[in-house]
Amino acid sequence: MAESLLELKKKIASIQKTGQITEAMRMVSGVKLNRTEKLDQEYTIYNDKVRATVSHLMSSQIVNQLGKETNEYSEFSGQSNIDYSSFFDLGTLASLVQPRKEIKSTGYLVISGDRGLVGSYNSQVIKNMMSIFKDADAQNKDVKILAVGSVAAQFFKKQNLNVVYEYSGVSDVPTYNEVRDIVQTAVKMYLNGVYDELFVCYTHHVNTLTSAFRVESMLPISDIDINHKETMPKDYIIEPDIDSVLKTVLPQFAKSMIFGAILDAKTAEHASSMTAMQSASQNADDVVSGLKTKLNRARQAQITTEITEIIGGANALE
């Protein structure tokens, strides 16, 4: 019985330590969530305005002045070191705006986490993407994957899927500069004909307990969709010229879309982590409570046995 009591005490101590760790992780995730949630809410306002501006421009007559629809890839094809600003010359703008006549390959920029202990966050990303890839395979569609986050990248490679780019190590509170390489690569691959359309796939943060998986079109830019019902003018007065305006607006659109998705996904990841650690801490408390009850019963049984033995011995002496 003494050995059993000792084992129970060891279990209680071990689980209490685990509970302390998960509680500390919950608090850390909560701090990160507060920071990213505030940034996400503020950035969403800016991001929606950029998307609305681009959507308005795409629906106006100025796009027709960029040239006829083309399936030709840009002059940057085959180059590896491209200056970011040089993406957006007039010919390249036409390539980014006009849909291609034939969709031979589809790119998916998938945002996941770099580590576990985040609840169902990563598994839901993978589950949703595998469903998309299964449908694409059934239709004999070629798929190219750009993976932001090591969890998804490693899983997709184990499944022998075509991961053409991977990026890991995004900060817990992402910065605008971090998306630079991702945007450059995504646009360059589109211009080089690696894929003919690109979708950004990520987890949208709704609230602490709720998230929603989103798949949004990024390239070609004419395919973007926004949630507004404003009456859009048929044309604009452009100053100083179309080229200058689009060279400014389209890079902002590309960066804001990817950064917004990463920031939103990080917020959802922190919320999932906090919820998971809170649940783990509560489970640890419940297990400890059950073990303490079991320990007290074992102690009571031990005391009862000892008293019975003492009484029995005393009676034997009479």
From Swiss-Prot:
Pfam families hit by this protein: ATP-synt (PF00231)
InterPro entries assigned to the protein according to its UniProt record, in alphabetical order: ATP_synth_F1_ATPase_gsu, ATP_synth_F1_gsu, ATP_synth_F1_gsu_CS
Main location per the UniProt record: membrane
Compartment annotation: Cell membrane
Alphabetical keyword list: ATP synthesis, Cell membrane, CF(1), Hydrogen ion transport, Ion transport, Membrane, Transport
Record keyword Repressor present: no
Gene Ontology cellular-component terms listed: plasma membrane; proton-transporting ATP synthase complex
GO terms of molecular function: ATP binding; proton-transporting ATP synthase activity, rotational mechanism
Family to which this protein belongs: Belongs to the ATPase gamma chain family.
The protein's name: ATP synthase gamma chain
Provenance organism: Lactobacillus johnsonii (strain CNCM I-12250 / La1 / NCC 533)
Lineage: Bacteria, Bacillati, Bacillota, Bacilli, Lactobacillales
